[in-house]
Amino acid sequence: MRRTLFVLFVVAFCFIGSVIANLSLPPGFSLRKRLPRSLVDILHLRHEQGLRDDTELRNWLSKQQPAMNKMFSSSSRENGSEKPVVSDVLPKNRAINIFASLTRQFEPIESRLNDSSKNITVLAPRNSAIQSLPRKPWENPEDYEKFGGVSAYEGQEGEDRAKQNLQRFVEAHIIPASPWREGEEMETLGGEKLKWIKKGDKIYIQPGNVEVDNIAETVINGELWILNSVLNYR
């Protein structure tokens, strides 16, 4: 009896297998072909666009990491023969190393940070604040409207526009004076007028009500403030 049931089971299994084989998709047939062509194209383009956007973001962020040779280079100030200046302490704070790297893109700004004879207040946004911007610091919506989304930053002229935008971003976060007193209106290197007020134990920069996380460093030529968001630079 058991042997008979086993034989019947084997026969049934073989029969079902042959049916499934006959219903198999022909070689080379893709389930993707069952989708309407227009939908396939849209999904494909969205996937490629997503990859491009992600790659662009990762590439941009990787370029903003501080140059290791600059970050750890020794000078007479590092050895204690001179007091440190803002340019010495700025790249050492990992929370703001994106902004620190941007300041090194422009020789006049870097020189000012390194000048012990001229006081300065650096308002450095945290990395997370820059990363959460709706657009890159070098992007300007007006450029896209005037030159188009594709060619706004292509070629030498496009690169120059991007560099100018980036410089404005950095200059909007630097005040050529220190100390900066509460309620005192000061003009940034970019020409914007700012002041700060204190609410409880928190400091807020106006306009924009930008919260100061902390005053990280006080050195011979000024102070380094860390911000929880970016200042208006347009």
Swiss-Prot record:
Q: Which GO terms describe its cellular component?
A: vacuole
FAS1 domain span: 83-231
Does the UniProt entry include the keyword Signal?
Answer: yes
Q: Which UniProt keywords apply?
A: Signal, Vacuole
The protein's location, in the record's own words, is: Vacuole
Known SUPFAM superfamilies for this protein?
Answer: FAS1 domain
Q: Which domain of life is it from?
A: Eukaryota
Q: What is its main location?
A: other
InterPro entries noted in UniProt: FAS1_dom_sf, FAS1_domain, Mug57-like
Report the leader peptide range. Answer: 1-21
Entries under PROSITE patterns matching the protein: FAS1
User: What is the protein's name according to its record?
Assistant: FAS1 domain-containing protein AFUA_8G05360
In its UniProt entry, the species of origin is given as: Aspergillus fumigatus (strain ATCC MYA-4609 / CBS 101355 / FGSC A1100 / Af293)
